[in-house]
Amino acid sequence: GKLEEPVPYDRLQAPGRIQALFFRDRVKGNAEVLDREALERAARFASLTRPDRVWVIGLAAFDTWANALQNLPGIEDYWSGYGGNCYVAQCVRESRYMATEFLKRLSRKYPGARSRHLQEGAKQYEKELKLMEEFTRIFPYKWPIPEDWRREVQRHKIEKGAEILRKMRPLEEAAIKEMKKALEEWKSA
């Protein structure tokens, strides 16, 4: 029954890191306009590319990730290799859940053609989510770092993981396409 003192972020002493966003003030505005803008941002972010050799984002990231998995056996640093792969997989899995729920929520709010495209986009993200759930079973994130983590780096797991990642790109492309179609319908609604 007693409120606890908040712990400053720099004294959490937690493994890894915690990220959270909090908004004090409620955003005011036209809900439909805000929803459309959120969908525009989602489609834009999902479509991003980056023209350098160090960082890969957007659709190309799935191919790059699948190819990079082949290098896991030779990477001795946990976070640069196996652990980083597992951590990123958890983040991608969670983002696909959020994308699915976001599009489902919008599809319930806005009937007609917009709803159909949003539902179809949600289905694509749901398929990605299922694939990432399978991927994270193959490459589970564990903390603290397991002493025997090198035993987890097995060729058959790497091949299966790469196969899963290569299935992601066409689903992502389809989801982006559906979001853009929903936005086109928004203009004529």
Where are these regions (language model features)?
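Noncatalytic regulatory segments and standalone regulatory/sensor domains
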Residues: 1-108
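Charged, long alpha-helical assembly modules
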Residues: 87-90, 94-189
